[in-house]
Amino acid sequence: MGIAIWLKGMRPQTLPASVAPVVIGAAAAWTSIRQLGVCALTYPAPESCAINRATQTTLESRFWPLAILCALVALFLQIAVNFANDYSDGVRGVDEGRGAASPALPASPASSSSAVPTGTPPAAVVLSGRRDGIAATSIHAPARLVASGVPPKRVLTSAGTAAALACLCGLAIVVITGHWWLLAVGVCCLLAGWCYTGGRHPYGYTGLGELFVFVFFGLVAVLGTQFVLCGTVTATGVLGAVQAGLLSCVLLMVNNLRDVDSDRVHGKRTLAVRLGERRARILAVASYAVAFVPVAVMALSPLVLSALSLVGLPCWWRTSSWVGINASGEQESGSSGGWACALPSPPDTLTWAMAAYGVVCLAIAALTIRALLRRDHARALPLIGLSLLVCAVGYAGLAAI
């Protein structure tokens, strides 16, 4: 077997789901570290200012080594999970017919073009025919290692090697930070990765995959990275964790939507199988929109407000209270109101840069939602991964301002 099949076995389209949350967590941590240097302009300076600056210096000195180690932990864990998933599904027979050299299977009459909605691209057609008793998978389902003839033990060994590399990087993080309880978090991550499709009762076969992905690729990955880098968790980190978790869930949901017919035949009751193809697709689109569209809206809002200010908007009703002395020497009070409008504010370079970022986000969102609605899973998967990376770039950009 050549190296190409091993690279495909790593499932590169899923790797952004591991690296992007680390970038988001690192960006949130960098913002917190910078705020440690802010001190009240009082004399003499409070003692807390000196303590905060010393802490800031320490955190900044080890920021990049720890950030790189966090990224490597996430990357190696994702690769280990992908190999373990390939092994478990392969030995169970779920991936039969998904070898590197497996020919495309002809559609049965039940899945002929007459049953496909007009305008549906070829990528959306899921074959429901059977050959030699094996259920067919979707046309664009990627090849799997075990199904391609790679010995299962070699795939399992590769998963163990990737997991061991993740553990080494994790141990380095523990030694540097002194947070020994992170070892327990690492064990939970390893167990979650293996039990997705491994063991006697894999939770990926019962529709709980998305829940665990939200927890480990969202909350744990983002907030864990932030805590490792700055020793605290902030609202920015929580928001980023929710967004990363939702987008990672959508990535898994689309993957399962692509394989929904094959999974149903093999008894793999993913969330897509439990909900049904239509409802699962609606949930995927809604989750994606909730997680990613607000990023574009927030990026475009400064330009919109700037444009409105140039035409005398936005305006609001302003009420003011007053207290005075009348002619009789008695105190009087009252209130008055009137319209107030924002002063004209031409957009600056930062506003234009954010607007350009927002336009890119809107374009990606439109293409992704279109691909999801048209059942074009081959195009939707990389677009969702790109959305994760673009979201991470946005957080990194805000942290750098």
Positions of predicted regions on the chain:
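Multi-pass membrane catalytic core of lipid/isoprenoid biosynthesis enzymes
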Residues: 99-110, 115-176, 272-304, 344-349, ...
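Small-residue-rich segments of transmembrane alpha-helices in multi-pass membrane proteins
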Residues: 21-25, 211-226, 273-277, 382-397
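Acidic (Asp/Glu-rich) catalytic motifs at the cytosolic membrane interface
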Residues: 76-103, 122-129, 134-135, 249-272
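Functional transmembrane core segments of multi-pass inner-membrane proteins
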Residues: 212-260, 266, 278-282
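Membrane-embedded alpha-helical segments that form the functional core of polytopic membrane enzymes
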Residues: 22, 35, 58-84, 183-194, ...
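Intramembrane alpha-helical segments
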Residues: 140-232
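Extended hydrophobic alpha-helices typical of membrane-associated regions
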Residues: 300-307, 323, 329, 344-401
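Topogenic membrane-insertion module of multi-pass membrane proteins
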Residues: 1-43, 47-52, 59-65, 69, ...
